[in-house]
């Protein structure tokens, strides 16, 4: 309502929600339902170029395209979803991987550090230069079908957070920001400034900027 009252000529109202679809966000709007969309970034948002744009049943013609062109003018890499889905693209992919990572550890197949080592030193670096569809297309789908038929039936299909998460939350071990500084890892004694530098380093290289000295 504040936007409606103070910005009568506004062309688009963008939410950065990672899960709410536009129709939920526009439900309380009285005037500009057709201009409300989601433009979801990934953190650190000032460095990561990707945005996922999503409209709803009320979204007006041309609104998504206007937002896409605006972001492209800022050297971002936006995509427009053909229809809403909880979690959009990025979080659906990320949490599908997270669900299986949790399953691997709970099943006794490996430890959390093993999962992270696999991600750091196997296929994740590849996907900064080519996409998943490109990768499997280039490898020949006739080979891919065997792996799909073998692995897919064994993957986790749980529909809620597992005990590995809920048990830790119950005892207060919610991660690096917890009073205990424990989650899956023990963060006591970890240099958090150095950790944050590791978080940001790939993006500095990706956009060809020099790492800051301070």
Q: Which functions belong to the PLM regions below?
A:
Residues 21, 97, 143:
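Short phosphate-engaging motifs
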Residues 65, 76-82, 107, 112-214:
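NAD(P)-dependent Rossmann-like dehydrogenase/reductase catalytic/cofactor-binding core
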Residues 12-83, 87, 91:
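Rossmann-fold dinucleotide-binding core
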Residues 1-12:
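Rossmann-like NAD(P)-binding element
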Residues 15, 54, 105-106, 169-170:
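Hydrophobic residues in alpha-helical segments
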Residues 27, 96-103, 110-112:
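Oxidoreductase and adenylate-handling cofactor-binding alpha/beta cores
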Residues 70, 103-104:
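Residues within well-ordered alpha helices
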Residues 49-50, 97-101, 146-151:
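A general alpha-helix detector
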